[in-house]
Amino acid sequence: MKSAKKLLSVLCLGIFILTFTACDMVEKTPEAKAKSTIAKVNGEKIQRKDLDESPNMQQVLSQIKTQYGEEFEKTEQGKEVIKEQKKQILENLITEKVLLQKGKELKVIPKDEELNKEADKKVNEIKAVYNNDEKKFEETLKSTGFTKETLKEYLKDQIVIEKVINEVTKDVKVEDKDAQKYYNENQSMFTEKPNTMNVSHILVKTEDEAKKVKKRLDAKEDFAKVAKEVSQDTGSKEKGGLLGDISYSDSNYDPTFMKAAIALKSGEISNPVHTQWGYHIIKINSKKEYPVKKFDSVKEDIKKQLKQEKQQEAYTKKIEEWKKASKIKTYEKNLL
């Protein structure tokens, strides 16, 4: 099972991320179900087997079986969960189909000899994950529904998709001034060590409640005592509102909350801060801040990051444009 998950994980990295015929009373054979059309993209069919045999779908089914047991997918709840997952994966397959069609249009598909050579190289890279153990590799292929031939065909498609994406994003550039601007606006991200702050807060529903809390604190009432009385954050209330040490770059907290907290000095208490959770009164118990690295030492890393972000934006914009211009029809009734 671990080997299968490892292969699926490797294969799924290549996917950018990076649908009534006859009589319903007649149940289709497994072969007929596999060949049933779940989508058409500019006249080209996507069959159910394309979805069911995809690495993403295999990974989803593996996770569902591990988490909920072998019988879950047979239940009504399981069928609904799987159908929703299939709809998402079908959207990926539609995107891939559009990209493959554009590969022909843009003339970026390599000649057969070169494409086979690149695919063989990727196969060897996957084998290396298994220390070139041929038996283990073949067992894993079998457990994930692949043969050597279907794996190679899948990889050839991914190579073409990668070339289309490269074509779309080839003109993306980032100037030094862009990196300098990002550096100036995000200096807390480039310290010698991660900056941290020890934070407490009191969470209430309304602004009026928050103002009353702030008034009590301004009158020198104990923060922890007030938090235990009125805070609606059950996770920190009994600890006097203590959240503990938080890195300045922690993405688990609301960005508005983080911005307000970072702006405070040690010992300071904020005015009411509104987030999706309600109104916070934030207290900074202490801070550990470190020197900022010189711009020249982080410039190339910043440019690389910004380039990747711009490439993703360019790709997303282009694929949305292509899909909008395509004739796409899905057949969700054929997903299960």
Curated annotation (Swiss-Prot):
Quote the InterPro entries the UniProt record gives.
Answer: Foldase_PrsA (IPR023059), PPIase_dom_sf (IPR046357), PPIase_PpiC (IPR000297), PPIase_PpiC_CS (IPR023058), PrsA_foldase (IPR050245), Trigger_fact/SurA_dom_sf (IPR027304)
State the UniProt keywords alphabetically: Cell membrane, Isomerase, Lipoprotein, Membrane, Palmitate, Rotamase, Signal
Q: Single Gene Ontology BP term?
A: protein folding
Q: What reaction(s) does this enzyme catalyze?
A: [protein]-peptidylproline (omega=180) = [protein]-peptidylproline (omega=0)
Annotated Gene Ontology MF terms?
peptidyl-prolyl cis-trans isomerase activity
Q: Give the residue range of the signal peptide.
A: 1-22
Lipid link (S-diacylglycerol cysteine) located at?
23
Q: Where is the lipid attached (N-palmitoyl cysteine)?
A: 23
- Is Isomerase found in the keyword set? yes
Top-level taxon of origin: Bacteria
Recorded GO CC terms: plasma membrane
**Localization per record:** Cell membrane
The record gives the membrane topology as: Lipid-anchor
EC no. given is 5.2.1.8
Q: Where is the PpiC domain?
A: 194-286
Function, in words: Plays a major role in protein secretion by helping the post-translocational extracellular folding of several secreted proteins.
Family assignment from sequence similarity: Belongs to the PrsA family.
Supply the name of the protein: Foldase protein PrsA
Name the source organism: Clostridium botulinum (strain Langeland / NCTC 10281 / Type F)
Gene designation per UniProt: prsA
